[in-house]
């Protein structure tokens, strides 16, 4: 997501990393080929420029965030022309009796086990062979989660992309086509040499990936959810290529808009595991509720969910334009929100380097994000929205 303030971490180990690399064959980017290797990015509303891929990474190293909107040019899309979906969210929590026993089933051990394997791939860079392998492994875990649950109508599908690594979408049908989306991004990147250096991506965003996977597992244990009795459909998304400019999530929500899908809410979980920055600053452990470029009504409801289902409070924070995949939902007119591990300035400084490892994470903190995710998914599954 963002880039750490120091640049030396990945370089120091580069000689060792280069000596023991698995074969990483880059996969072609057909969209960029049309424009002779250049990409159209948007750094702020209306602020666009054509850049090379290396210029993209340079901007990210400088902490600049952006949409890669090259595909919009190819498809003649104009997302800002889309009408915003108007949704009225509940004024309080109505499913605590059902959610509390489910929340007790959330497992730190499951998240640790999944993340241990997920971070063992050399990189989950979206153009790499190991990025495809990690996506394949993730999809198999989701399939196992569904097959071991009572939810016979739940399903998981690939959402293919031209760059290789696919996004993954799991669907739990309800009584209507109104849909609540829970998202995280599965790719990782080492911002120094993306195609070569290791990118374990434990926090960014392996933590969000396994957090929502665990919430998904427990949600399917609900008899009402498993039998399809929820008012609304719930989807869990694991996006490819967030690090390339929100590419995977843009492709998903662009397709959803073309198909007239009725998305009522989208929550992004990107970086859920690092609490040390907050504690080192002498502040209370908390989750960070993003307040800029999000839907105000959904964000207000999420505050209630945190207060009702988490054991720690929230703090309000900002992350800027196009800072994670919720921005893609907003771009196509869908209400979205984002909850991160802390105040933005206290989030992990290890990301986008080989030092973003599982040892830096706090699984008790991730459990709080899982409780919030489960609570939101269940409450909105049965809400009149």
UniProtKB/Swiss-Prot annotation:
One of the GO biological process terms: proteolysis
Compartments, as annotated in UniProt: Secreted
Enzyme class: hydrolase
Glycosylation sites: 177, 229
Keyword Zinc: yes
Swiss-Prot/TrEMBL cofactor(s): Zn(2+)
Binding site for Zn(2+) 1: 185, 204, 270
GO molecular function: aminopeptidase activity; metal ion binding; metalloexopeptidase activity
Annotated binding of Zn(2+) 2, by residue: 204, 243, 352
Propeptide: 20-87
Assigned GO CC terms: extracellular region
UniProt keyword annotations, A-Z: Aminopeptidase, Disulfide bond, Glycoprotein, Hydrolase, Metal-binding, Protease, Secreted, Signal, Zinc, Zymogen
Signal sequence region: 1-19
Cofactor stoichiometry and binding remark: Binds 2 Zn(2+) ions per subunit.
Pfam families reported in the protein's UniProt record: Peptidase_M28
Entry EC no(s): 3.4.11.-
Disulfide linkage: 319-323
InterPro entries xrefs: M28_fam, Peptidase_M28
Subunit structure comment from the entry: Monomer.
Entry similarity comment: Belongs to the peptidase M28 family. M28E subfamily.
PANTHER family: AMINOPEPTIDASE YDR415C-RELATED, METALLOPEPTIDASE M28 FAMILY MEMBER
UniProt function note: Extracellular aminopeptidase that allows assimilation of proteinaceous substrates.
Protein name per the record: Leucine aminopeptidase 1
Species name: Ajellomyces dermatitidis (strain ER-3 / ATCC MYA-2586)
């Amino acid at each position: 997501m963002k880039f750490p303030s120091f640049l030396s971490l990945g370089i120091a180990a580069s000689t060792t990393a280069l000596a023991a690399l698995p074969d990483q064959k880059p996969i072609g980017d057909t969209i960029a080929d049309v424009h002779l290797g250049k990409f159209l990015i948007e750094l702020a509303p209306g602020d666009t420029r054509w850049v090379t891929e290396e210029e993209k990474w340079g901007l990210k190293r400088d902490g600049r965030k952006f949409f890669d909107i090259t595909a919009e040019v190819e498809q003649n899309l104009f997302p800002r022309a889309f009408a915003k979906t108007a949704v009225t969210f509940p004024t309080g929590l109505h499913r605590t009796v059902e959610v509390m026993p489910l929340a007790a089933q959330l497992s730190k051990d499951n998240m640790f086990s999944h993340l241990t394997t997920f971070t063992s791939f050399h990189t989950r860079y979206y153009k790499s062979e190991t990025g495809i392998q990690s996506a394949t492994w993730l999809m198999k875990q989701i399939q196992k989660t569904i097959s071991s649950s009572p939810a016979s109508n739940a399903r998981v599908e690939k959402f293919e992309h031209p760059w290789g690594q696919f996004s993954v979408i799991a669907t739990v049908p309800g009584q209507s086509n109104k849909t609540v989306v829970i998202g995280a991004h599965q790719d990782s990147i080492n911002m120094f040499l993306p195609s070569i250096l290791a990118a374990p991506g434990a926090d960014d965003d392996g933590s969000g990936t396994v957090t929502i996977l665990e919430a998904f597992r427990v949600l399917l244990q609900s008899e009402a959810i498993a039998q399809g009795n929820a008012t609304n459909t719930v989807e869990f998304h694991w996006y490819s290529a967030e690090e390339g400019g929100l590419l995977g999530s843009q492709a998903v929500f662009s397709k959803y808009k073309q198909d007239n899908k009725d998305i009522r809410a989208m929550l992004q979980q990107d970086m859920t595991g690092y609490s040390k920055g907050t504690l080192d600053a002498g502040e209370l452990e908390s989750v960070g509720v993003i307040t800029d470029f999000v839907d105000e009504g959904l964000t207000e409801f999420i505050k209630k969910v945190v207060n009702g289902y988490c054991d720690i409070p929230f703090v309000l924070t900002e992350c800027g334009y196009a800072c994670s995949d919720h921005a893609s939902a907003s771009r196509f007119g869908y209400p979205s929100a984002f909850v991160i591990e802390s105040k933005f300035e206290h989030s992990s400084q290890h990301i986008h380097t080989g030092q973003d490892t599982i040892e830096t994470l706090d699984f008790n903190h991730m459990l709080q994000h899982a409780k919030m995710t489960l609570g939101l998914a269940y409450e909105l599954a049965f809400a009149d929205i």
